[in-house]
Amino acid sequence: MKPTFLDFEQPIAELENKIEELRFVQDDSVLDISEEIARLQKKSLELTKTLYAKLTPSQIAMVARHPQRPYTLDYIQAIFTDFEELHGDRAFADDAAIVGGLARFNGQSVMVIGHQKGRDTKEKIRRNFGMPHPEGYRKALRLMKLAEKFGIPVLTFVDTTGAWPGIGAEERGQSEAIGRNLYEMTNLRVPIVVTVIGEGGSGGALAIAVGDHVNMLQYATYSVISPEGCASILWKTAERASDAAEALGITAPRLKTLGLIDRVVTEPVGGAHRDHAQMMTTLKRVLQDQLKEVQSKPMDALLKERFDRLMSYGRFKEDAA
């Protein structure tokens, strides 16, 4: 697949296009230009490292939304085996914006749940652009309760702009579905490991993100509202989205400092979309260590820590005047 470059990556795009041109010439020429290609590849790598070392929060938001970034089903296919998808909330419908089912992780039975976006237009519409309806969250809860019944851990993957705000979703109890998930996940008597792999948008993300260990990929985002939405409310224009992104503190390092996540998972140079295989290998190793850690703790201790984490969200302290 030909890489898609973001606006701030245009200098990289120009180098990569030059490399492709030279490769085409080399295939049809007796001249050996492999050294020149290698030199440009090295230059492209160094430029990518330089650009990504100083990304602004708004640029990180662009990376988190990259259309070639790995989605939940990509991680499931690469990290887990024997995945059996389970469908429906047993009340209204099967929401394709949430996927989940039984799988094996290093031979151990687990329940995997996550938001799922689409690649092409047809798939994006079917998945509702990764924005779940209430039935999606109720499906997720049904699978979590099933995991509790079987005594197997739950692993969730968060990647959504937010819960779907349509009239039908509100009529079917969107806020109740999200609130119910928060309540039930806090008391679920199995280990839960959460990973924010792309966008972590508001309650739509939090509804499957209450866990014992919360990871966040290096260029993922997690916030109460999108930068564009925040700017539209505060300044009546989405053009100040970069200011909003800075103020919201949407990046993984910032959230780690605030204690809202436990670990920042390093991405390949240029983001997870540049090297799916490397990203999968890194995350699998992280999940393996964390699952072993949380499973070694008494369940009552896990529940207390999980509850305390949820109650700490939104808490702040004012400095004395």
Curated annotation (Swiss-Prot):
Keywords: ATP-binding, Cytoplasm, Fatty acid biosynthesis, Fatty acid metabolism, Lipid biosynthesis, Lipid metabolism, Nucleotide-binding, Transferase. GO terms for molecular function: acetyl-CoA carboxylase activity; ATP binding; carboxyl- or carbamoyltransferase activity. Pfam families: ACCA. Disulfide bonds: none annotated. Residues 32-293 form the CoA carboxyltransferase C-terminal domain. Signal peptide: none annotated. Pathway: Lipid metabolism; malonyl-CoA biosynthesis; malonyl-CoA from acetyl-CoA: step 1/1. Acetyl-CoA carboxylase is a heterohexamer composed of biotin carboxyl carrier protein (AccB), biotin carboxylase (AccC) and two subunits each of ACCase subunit alpha (AccA) and ACCase subunit beta (AccD). This is Acetyl-coenzyme A carboxylase carboxyl transferase subunit alpha.
